[in-house]
Structures are given as structure tokens and as C-alpha cells.
Amino acid sequence: MKIDIHTHILPKEWPDLEKRFGYGGWVQLQQQGKGEAKMMKDGKVFRVIQQNCWDPEVRIREMNQKGVTVQALSTVPVMFSYWAKPKDTLELCQFLNNDLAATVARYPRRFVGLGTLPMQAPGLAVEEMERCVKELGFPGIQIGSHINMWDLNDPELFPIYTAAERLNCSLFVHPWDMQMDGRMAKYWLPWLVGMPSETTTAICSMIMGGVFEKFPKLKVCFAHGGGAFPFTIGRIAHGFNMRPDLCARDNSSDPRKYLGSFYTDSLVHDPLSLKLLTDVIGKDRVILGTDYPFPLGEQEPGKLIESMADFDEETKDKLTAGNALTFLGLERKLFE
């Protein structure tokens, strides 16, 4: 069994949000003919997507070809829209979540849903989380690596974490809103360097901000193998202990204490990196994630995990399925 925690999906179409809300910055979908569309933002192409980004039947066909049993579906992070007026973001979130729920309902043995929330308005976010879990049946939510000027340790977000614990709602943290201009404007650096940096910042913020201390039952998984965090934990812990005046202001516990308190996906593209990741984060805390259907994703889902001579069959099963089931609070028999 293979359960992919990290995949993205969009509706086939959605309303003209600039006309609906009366201001720019929204992502629009421009169909280019059968099987291809452009995601447009402020008149510029953000990304060209293929039919597998919106058509569940195409996805299932490709899943069958690659041996993937289940995909956890989440929106493309540029759709988060945390910058917008909260009521407008809420309306978009409800549209995206309803579309996601309809897809899961059609194929409940192949898909599970990770919803999206208007995180810039925690009260509204909690209400939509309640709806996602209780009405739509989602086991989790995808959130960004920061919410405008809030890092993930900001007390404004604590009501969301309280609700997530109460509802047993898992959080999948995805980097977004990287610096795109200046020195980062070339070589695809926002995706190659900016995303790992965003994820590392999110992990450090939650650790040093005491989030895992305050919310010990919170289930969090970070995308892209936790960014640079597994490789730089030594530097982070050393800096914490050498400069507690800067690093221990909100939490006095060594960062290493929280290894094992959160999950990452497995998307590191390299056997040495995957070995390090499981050594640092734990073999019980790494989950197969591919970033399907995008080019930076793992093109052969689970192949790297299966190729690892250091992993026994029990470990491989944990990484490809068991850890995802634990993180999402689901039973294997639902998908067998």
C-alpha cells in the first residue's frame, strides 16, 4: 500500500474572483484547450497545469500506473489567499473545500481531503475547520508556512491549534509566499532554495515558540522533508544553547527535545538525504509525499523508499503507508 500525503488538486473551473470581490491579486484559471490550462495572477502566468491537476479520473489512472493506493488531496498553495479580505478568503476556501469533498465522495477509497482555511482570521478559520472535519469528513488541513507577518508560533494562531487538538485534525504545513524578486528571480531559486528555507523557519518557529509544548497532541507534518531542518539541527541546537537570550525567549527546552514530535514527508530526492531524514526525524515520523502532479515532485512514487537497503520491510511499510494512517487517524482497512 502507498499513501501519498503530498499532492495538489484544483477545481476544473472557478468564478472570476477579481470581478466577484472587486480587487486584484486572485488566481484565475485560463483554459488553453483540452488537457491544459494556465493559472494567471495579475495578468501573468503563474503556472501551466495539465488535466491531472483537476481531473480525478486522470489522477486515478496515473495512480494505478504508479502503484499509489491513496492520495491526500490539498489545494495549490498560491490559492491560500491569506492576504485578502477574510470574508473573501473564507468564500474561496468554502468553494475549494466543497469541490474537494465532492471528489473524495466520488472516490472514497482513493482520496482523502486536506482542506484550506482563512488563516488570517483565526475565528473564521476555526469555524471552517469545524465544517471540514464534521461535515466534509476531512482528517486534516493544509496551512502555509507563515500567515502574512505571523510565523506559526504567533499567539493569534493558538485558537486554531486548540481546535485542531480538539477535533483531532492533522495539519500539513506547506511552504509558500517565498521571495520572488531581486537575487531570487533567477534559476528557479524560490522553489529550490526559498521553499526549504520557509519550511525550516516554520519548524524553528513552532519549536522555539513553544507550540509543541503548549499543544502536545497537535499532529503536524512539514512538506519537502522538513526543508533544511534535518541537516541543520546541529547548528540550530548549538545556537539555541549558546544564545538563549535570543533563542530561548519563549521556550527554554532544547530543540532536540521535539524530534519525534512532528512529521515530515519523504520528498528529498536523494538516498543520503532520506537516510539522514529518518535518522533525525524518526522512521515513525516520515511519510511518503510526492508533490504530484508537479515537476519538482517524485516521478516514481515510493521508489526512493523502496530502494533503501538500510530499510527493512517494516520500515518501508511505515514510510509508504503506516505513518500516513497514524498521522491522519485513519484505518488501513478503509483502503484495502
UniProtKB/Swiss-Prot annotation:
Pathway: Secondary metabolite metabolism; quinolate metabolism. Liver and kidney. Very low levels detected in brain. GO terms for biological process: L-tryptophan catabolic process; negative regulation of quinolinate biosynthetic process; secondary metabolic process. One of its GO terms (molecular function) is zinc ion binding. Pfam families: Amidohydro_2. The keyword Transport does not apply. Optimum pH is 6. It comes from the Eukaryota. Zn(2+) binds at H6, H8, H174, D291. Substrate binds at R47. The keyword Protease does not apply. One of its GO terms (cellular component) is cytoplasm. Its EC number is 4.1.1.45. It catalyses: 2-amino-3-carboxymuconate 6-semialdehyde + H(+) = 2-aminomuconate 6-semialdehyde + CO2. Optimum temperature is 40 degrees Celsius. Keywords: Decarboxylase, Lyase, Metal-binding, Zinc. Converts alpha-amino-beta-carboxymuconate-epsilon-semialdehyde (ACMS) to alpha-aminomuconate semialdehyde (AMS). ACMS can be converted non-enzymatically to quinolate (QA), a key precursor of NAD, and a potent endogenous excitotoxin of neuronal cells which is implicated in the pathogenesis of various neurodegenerative disorders. In the presence of ACMSD, ACMS is converted to AMS, a benign catabolite. ACMSD ultimately controls the metabolic fate of tryptophan catabolism along the kynurenine pathway. Monomer. Belongs to the metallo-dependent hydrolases superfamily. ACMSD family. PANTHER family: 2-AMINO-3-CARBOXYLMUCONATE-6-SEMIALDEHYDE DECARBOXYLASE (PTHR21240), 2-AMINO-3-CARBOXYMUCONATE-6-SEMIALDEHYDE DECARBOXYLASE (PTHR21240:SF27). This is 2-amino-3-carboxymuconate-6-semialdehyde decarboxylase. It comes from Rattus norvegicus. The lineage of its organism: Eukaryota, Metazoa, Chordata, Craniata, Vertebrata. The gene is Acmsd.
